[in-house]
C-alpha cells in the first residue's frame, strides 16, 4: 500500500485498514469536539516528500497542550492511538519543520471581499500571500537552531484596487518543539499599528486589518 509523495493517507482502522482519506501538502486540518471525524483516524501513510504534524488538541486555551508528534517522510504509522485521539494535523513539505497558518480579516466597513492582500515573508523563506475572504494559508518554516528560535516575518498589506500598501511592518513567530504550539511576538516598534492578531488555535493566527492608515 502506498500514497503519492506529496500526500498523507489516513485510515479509520489500525494497520492502515478501513475507510481512508488523502490530504495534500499544504493542508492543515482540524476537528473540533463533536465533529464526525474528531478522534477517528487510527493510522496513516506519509508520502515520501512530506512530513505530518499531528496533535491531540487544537485549542490554544486547552489547559494542557496535549500530545504532539511529527510523522517522518515516507513513514507507515500503523497505530496512532498514542496521540489519544487525533484532532489536528498539518501536511508540510519534507524540508520544513513546522508551519504557521495565517489569514487576513478586513474590519473596514463597506469594502468588498478581496479588497486587501496580505504578504508574509519569513526571513529566508518564500513568501505566502492571502486575501481577505480566503481561508487559512499554511506558511512552512524550516528547522531553526536552536529549534525554539524566533523567526522574523515581514507583514505587508496592499489595497488590491489601487495597489497602495496600507500596512507594513514585522512580527516574530516561535515554535515549541515539545508541544508543536506556535506563538507570536509583535513589538510596538515594528508591528503595523492599524492591525492586530488573534490566535485561533495552536498554530493559526488571524491578522485583522482595522484601518487603512
Swiss-Prot record:
GO terms for biological process: calcium-dependent cell-cell adhesion via plasma membrane cell adhesion molecules. Keywords: Calcium, Cell adhesion, Cell membrane, Membrane. Its main location: membrane. One of its GO terms (cellular component) is cell-cell junction. It is found in: Cell membrane. Pfam families: Crystall_3, Membrane_bind. One of its GO terms (molecular function) is calmodulin binding. Mediates calcium-dependent cell-cell adhesion during the early stage of development. Belongs to the Dictyostelium CAD family. This is Putative calcium-dependent cell adhesion molecule 3.
Amino acid at each position: 500500500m502506498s500514497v503519492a509523495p506529496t500526500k498523507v493517507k489516513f485510515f479509520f482502522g489500525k494497520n492502515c485498514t478501513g475507510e481512508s482519506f488523502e490530504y495534500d501538502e499544504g493542508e492543515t486540518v482540524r476537528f473540533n469536539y463533536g465533529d464526525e471525524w474528531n478522534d477517528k483516524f487510527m493510522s496513516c501513510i506519509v508520502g515520501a516528500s512530506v512530513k505530518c504534524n499531528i496533535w491531540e488538541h487544537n485549542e490554544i486555551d486547552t489547559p494542557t497542550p496535549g500530545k504532539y508528534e511529527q510523522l517522518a517522510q515516507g513513514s507507515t504509522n500503523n497505530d496512532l492511538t498514542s496521540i489519544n485521539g487525533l484532532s489536528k494535523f498539518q501536511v508540510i513539505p519534507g524540508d520544513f519543520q513546522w508551519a504557521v497558518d495565517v489569514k487576513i480579516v478586513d474590519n473596514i466597513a463597506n469594502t468588498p471581499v478581496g479588497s486587501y492582500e496580505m504578504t508574509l515573508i519569513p526571513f529566508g523563506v518564500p513568501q505566502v500571500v492571502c486575501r481577505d475572504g480566503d481561508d487559512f494559508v499554511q506558511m512552512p518554516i524550516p528547522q531553526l537552531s536552536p529549534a525554539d528560535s524566533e523567526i522574523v516575518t515581514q507583514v505587508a498589506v496592499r489595497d488590491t484596487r489601487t495597489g497602495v500598501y496600507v500596512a507594513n511592518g514585522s512580527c516574530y513567530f516561535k515554535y515549541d518543539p515539545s508541544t508543536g504550539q506556535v506563538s507570536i511576538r509583535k513589538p510596538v516598534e515594528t508591528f503595523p499599528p492599524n492591525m492586530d492578531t488573534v490566535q485561533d488555535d495552536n498554530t493559526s493566527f488571524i491578522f485583522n486589518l482595522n484601518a487603512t492608515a
